[in-house]
Amino acid sequence: PGVNDVDSTKVRIFSYGGFNSPYKQLSRFVKLQYKEELVQHVSVPMLISIMTPEDRSGRSGDHVPFRQKNFAACRFTSANEHGNASNGVGYTDRQHTSGDILGIDTDFNGQIDSFFVDFNYLARNAVINGAAATIVAKGPKKPDFSISTIVGPGLIVEITDQTQYSTYRVGLRTLTND
């Protein structure tokens, strides 16, 4: 996408590590939970893309220090962004830099009337973020487990701790991040 391109139906999730990292697992669970629990209740469905890198090129977010303290963490970002975090002459950015542009006065009446935000898009993403925060807060601790036997097209998973829960759901991923 180019500068000022808009995509109001997609959100990207960035997280650290390879396919099986706890961070990518959290990202996949957020996407799965959205597809299974939320999408049927929304008027404009969102496409969630799980990205390979930990964050966008030249950027970093609050999820990094959480990951550094061994918390599963991920970052939600818009599908397209204005700018690439460079600091060259004449560069403008609206992505929480020290030179943020809050908005502009499009009709020159002294009032900011364009905030560079689609508030409907923001609301849809807030629902996804809120649901993710809820499942992380309410969910059980991740159990230790072993795969004891591979049986035909399936496998047997043995939960070795956190056994107070009667049921665990085991998900298998595709060969891509999603």
Predicted feature locations:
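Beta-strand signatures of extracellular beta-sandwich domains
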Residues: 169-173
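Conserved aromatic anchor
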Residues: 153-164
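Hydrophobic alpha-helix feature that most strongly marks membrane-spanning transmembrane helices
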Residues: 35, 134-138, 175
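Metal-dependent peptidase/peptidase-like ectodomains
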Residues: 1-64, 69-73
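Proline-enriched interdomain boundary motifs that mark the N-terminal boundary
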Residues: 138-150
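Active-site-adjacent mobile loop/cap segments within catalytic or ligand-binding domains
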Residues: 1-5, 50-140
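A broad structural signal for short, well-ordered beta-strand segments within beta-sheet-rich domains
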Residues: 143-144, 163-167
